[in-house]
Amino acid sequence: MAGPTDTPLSAIGGIAHGGMQTIQGGTVTLYATQSNGYGGAALQLAPTTTTDTLGSFTLAPNVACPAGQYAYITIAAGDTGGASVNSNSLLMTALGKCSDLYSGTTYTGQPVWVDEVTTVAAAYALGNFTTVSGSGASAVVNISAPTNNTGTYSVTVPSAGGLAHAFMNALALVNPYSGQPYATYNNKAGYGVIPDAEIFLLGNILQSCVNSTGTTGTNTAMANDGTPCGKLFSMTTPPVSGASTPTNTMAAMLNLAHYPNPSVNTWSTDCTTAGGGTSTATSCLFGLSTSEGAYGGPLTSAPPDWALAVVWPQGYGVQTGANCSGTTCGGINYAYYVALDYQDNVYVLNTDSGTSPTYTNINGFGPDMTPVFATANDTTYILIKEIATDIAGHVLGINAATSSSGNNYLRVYSTANGSLLVSTQAPTSSPLDAVIDTYNNVLYLSSSTSGTSLRRFTYGGTSAAPTYTTATLTPQLTGGAMQLTLDANLNIYAQEASSSNTFKVDYAANTGTYAAPAYGSAFTTTSLSGNVSLSVSPVSFGIVADANGNAYTGASGGLYKVTKNAGPPVSISGGAQISLPITYGTAMYFRYLYLDGSGNVLGPDNANGSVTSGVAVYDVADGGLALGTYKGCYVSYVTGIACGTTGSTSPMSSPRGAAIDSAGDIWVVSSASHNLTLLIGAAAPTWPALSMVKYGRPQ
């Protein structure tokens, strides 16, 4: 469907649609974001108006849209030619930065299109900053962020740019003036592939409610009134303790964006009663998208979940030229790990094989995935398994060779252009992982099962000319370390390797201060048991610390909590295994864990790609509730639509690493599918650089 006109207006106007039908009598409101916390009260910019019989509207002129903030528009209630007003309909369109829309108080953009598709894009991209208040024609969409997660990135304040990033995503998915999703991210040729078929399907699902007269009775997570709106609201009630059932279309889509695996209940055949039938919430939602749906080209079968996955395919990145250090850089290939810096820039570690690599390199991208650089295809240091960023402008990795090979080197690159700044030997055997503290020091351990000492590269010099001095510290392990993490006080957790069903987690206290961390005490240890395999060659491992100083560790069977017990002396104890959300038989892997801003733990599962891969997510505050495995759909130019139905067609086949940005998006690299996947808004906003060692949402 085309937009209403391409002629610029002095005041915002446009048209509202429910599918093919225009929305009459809908309440139109123009808002701007504010810097008053997550989902804080909206700022109304102009008096409300209503849509006419053609769905058209024009708002008052002379609008003062605040500098540094973002504008959006909503349509509440109205009817699409039915017998009565639908008080459950609430749609919106994200417009963008005030300074891009207005010259002084004069609107300089085009007429706006508001419908279900623009609502889907806004809900997924902006959901972490959005709340809904009021009801019916008085319903309000509040979009706000703390000052320190609005638009300015800084390590000295510190601050992030989550709201700016979220609006960038919304405008990169769907054109606000035509209501049409783009084929590629930001409508740029060769960029990430947008799942427009899934967006159309979600639009048709919303349309079933918008183009009705609304609900007729009570709707809960367990039952509904049988209306399209009632079914939508039941199926999008979050699967967490104490969750409220939504009462309008915007709230329903916000829930689905953040909980893409909806209600775990099974439902009756008519999708009205939970608990006794065989229908899933996903199939019930799919059933709302009828053959009369206005949005052409939707998925023709239910997806495995409702995650919105944008996929950058093999070969994307800097290929040749000034920012490619060799003519064979090649872009994304066998993507092995992903890291973010404090500005939400993205770094992908590449190789060509998981078992017999012949090279490694690093590709750097901006937050919008504009290619920035690619390091040379390094054929000497081919065993870098992970990369990390510091807060001084570097991305680095340690080559995991044996000490006898002489190739276990720390390699440090500039994040500005990918130039190699430092290559210095790491005097230990097969270091797999390294963590960076807030002072840019690098802590690492050997993965050798014969034992290892904690080592540190102390940072010095400048960003352009860094130096690193290595030292051996007091804490020692009897086995090899697979993963390390720092808690908020710079205490260290390590997960040891094991080839049995028992493995160890170790803890070393920071015996100095935060400003001058020191590690003068031995590791304290706890053992965990379950369906695990943590020897050096398999791929099941991971550990993260939370805001309270406890840790969560992963293995092939699932997730374990490690609790820090108050001393003196401080000790740690391990909890029971929390199983993966889906049982894969013997093909289970869970590794490279990450903690989002709400404290949820996530990590890629199923490394071998033999079955459907994805990102497993746990709500640890809700007793370790497994929220599901997020997969999404990949609309490939070559193979068509792949919705994670088999291992070979999943958007994430053999996912090897994940990271979360300040907007709450999950970035996932997958080796077998040779790509980078962005799950829009599927986590909570997070401080993007692990080296900031900050927990919780950016505030």
Regions found by a protein language model. Name each.
Residues 1-327, 331-334, 342:
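Feature for extracytoplasmic/surface-facing segments of secreted or surface-associated proteins
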Residues 284-699:
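Flexible "stalk/tail and boundary" regions
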